[in-house]
Amino acid sequence: MKSKRMGALLAVYCLSFMTLAGCSAENSRNYKQAAQDLKNGNYEIALEEYETSVAAGVKLAQSYRGAGVAQMKLGNYEDAITNFNNALACDKVGRKLKKDILSYRAAAYLKIKAYNEAMTDCQTLAESYDMDADLYFLTGEVALAMDSYEEAGSNFEQAYGEDATYDRAIQIYGAYLEKDMEADGTRYLEAALSKTAKNAQDHYDRGRVYYYMEDYDNAADELKKAIDSDNTEALALLGMVYMDQEDSENARTMFQKYVSQADNGAKGFNGLALCDMEAGDYDSALSNITSGIQTADGEEMQSLLFNEIVVYEKKLDFQTALQKAQEYLELYPEDKTVKKELAFLKTRVNVTDTQD
């Protein structure tokens, strides 16, 4: 009898162990999938998965951090900060992870205009870690928002000194442009152009810089050189150059080539939709937008969804435009342009927003 009871207990123990092991494996898969979805731009799904990981107690600090990043991408900055605070309060937060979380929290504080809190995090990072180009740039952004122009300039110079790339020059230029200080940012673009192009990527990057400077002739020259060396991304940007020059015929050709050659044609479909809108062919524009949405992610998805609103408005289908604007703001709640557009559309369809 004792032997039978022992056998039964062992069976229960084994079953419990297998169940726990199965749950543990499932939780681990969920956590890994969350990281993949975050990387792929599936932010709402990633957020749900990270919240599941938090509830299961799986890598708490990392899960809170992941949820915070997903919230940031969705424009929910205060919720992001809450997650970052929770992550920092966890028992086991490695030095490298803490640096990462503080950087994200500072960026989130910047978004909600909590400049003092953002600068406090930047100062903590400067005191506790070796500064790199990203931290210098972030500190410069915060200082610029606080109208501390000398401090901002010093940090931007350090950032570019650490990372004298075309991307960094464009990033600094964009920060100054937002403050209507374009001249201060242009010198970084000029510094980037002082380098000699060595390959197709360099020609593409130089084309980008010239495009931001609205020097379309030089932009086109550089992009054509990149295209001659099989740089596919240059096709889409050259299409935008032609659009800005009001040459929609050549623009359409570039976007069509991009769709046929790129691994993900979303950017090309978006460009074709712009050409259709220019021609007044709104049904074709919607068709191209629909094709683009099927494969788009990140910023390109946002641009496609924005253009979809515009097309319905151009078609005078204000009811659908209103619906699309409301759906858009659920994904990108910080977009002030669409918020204004939503208010206009409500007047067109006589809808009162009960949430306001």
Protein language model regions, located:
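Residue-level recognition of tetratricopeptide repeat
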Residues: 35, 69, 107, 141, ...
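Start-of-helix register in tetratricopeptide repeats
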Residues: 28-29, 62, 96-100, 134, ...
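Terminal, low-structured helical/coil segments at or just beyond the last alpha-helical repeat
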Residues: 310, 314-356
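Canonical tetratricopeptide repeat
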Residues: 66, 73, 97-104, 138, ...
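Register position in tetratricopeptide repeats
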Residues: 39-40, 73, 111, 145-146, ...
